[in-house]
Design a protein with these regions (language model features):
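Pre-active-site segment of Zn-dependent metallo-hydrolases
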Residues: 1-44, 48, 54-60, 164-171
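Active-site neighborhood of phospho(di)ester-bond hydrolases with catalytic His/Asp-centered motifs
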Residues: 11-15, 39-51, 69-70, 156-161, ...
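Structured loop/turn residues at beta-strand edges in well-structured enzyme cores
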Residues: 38, 48, 92, 113-115, ...
Length: 264
């Protein structure tokens, strides 16, 4: 979640453990006189993946809420994985606002005054249940460039990225903090563990290690903070005794963790 004032929060993606996250962070709790609700003013979805959307069900008693997403994501969430359809029965449901995939189309979610959001089209894949699986169109996955209007500082959030296009590289160059896809250490990781027959890139994720990986990409840019996010439990960087973890530390790349706070 991001905030410009520490009082109103915009939730970026809604993971399955959202209730636990809210219970652990008093910043999201409502004022004492509010019988039902949170300090979440709006939601921004970057894709229609299960791990980024099922937390919407947790928010059902606090609806209506504005949700910002691309039209492609909204289509998935009303057809292939119809959370929007289900939730419309709670107090008017989610009020969908379309995100234009044009990088120059800035927007400000409700409650985020003082911050400017820009969509960054990411080359990734749609969820397995989507009609766009392996038939990728702009809007299946986006990153977010978030700029503080007062300081001009920039945060770039890119949770699912198979390869970096020119816009991604441009935004990285302009950023003070980059939160980037760290799902898998190696492209063959899920195959090697016997969990899938697909490469990381088949699923839409750039491996962290190796030529063309996230480490090599991040090292191209002089960014104050580089943080890997969206880390799968098969990823060896989670073992702090591993050479992979120490390699990251030596290169100034951080691992995200639950409850991590970043001020930009």
């Amino acid at each position: 979640a991001v905030s410009s004032d520490g009082k109103n929060w915009v939730l970026i993606n809604a993971s399955p453990d959202l209730r636990e996250q809210m219970n652990s962070h008093p910043q999201l709790w409502p004022d004492a006189h509010v019988s039902r609700g949170t300090r979440i003013s709006a939601i921004v979805l970057t894709d229609s993946q299960i791990d980024h959307t099922t937390g919407l069900l947790t928010l059902r008693e606090g609806l209506p809420l504005p949700v910002y997403c691309t039209d492609v994501v909204a289509e998935d969430l009303t057809t292939s994985f119809p959370l929007f359809t289900v939730l419309k029965h709670w107090h008017g449901g989610l009020q969908q606002h379309s995100i234009n995939t044009d990088y120059h189309q800035r927007f400000v979610p409700k409650g985020a005054e003082g911050l400017t959001f820009q969509p960054v089209v990411l080359e990734s894949n749609a969820p397995p249940y989507s009609t766009y699986r392996d038939n990728i169109v702009p809007g299946n996955n986006i990153g977010l460039k978030i700029t503080d209007d007062t300081t001009g500082n920039v945060l770039f959030y890119a949770p699912g990225c198979m390869q970096a296009n020119d816009t991604v590289k441009q935004v990285m160059r302009e950023s003070h903090c980059v939160l980037f896809d760290g799902t898998l250490w190696a492209n063959e990781e899920m195959i090697d563990h016997g969990f899938s027959n697909k490469l990381g890139t088949d699923m839409g994720h750039m491996p962290v290690n190796g030529k063309g990986g996230a480490i090599a990409l991040l090292n191209e840019f002089n960014v104050e903070r580089k943080v890997l996010i969206h880390i799968n439990n098969t990823n060896r960087v989670l073992d702090e005794d591993s050479s992979a973890y120490h390699s990251l530390c030596e290169q100034g790349i951080e691992l995200a963790y639950d409850g991590m706070e970043i001020e930009v």
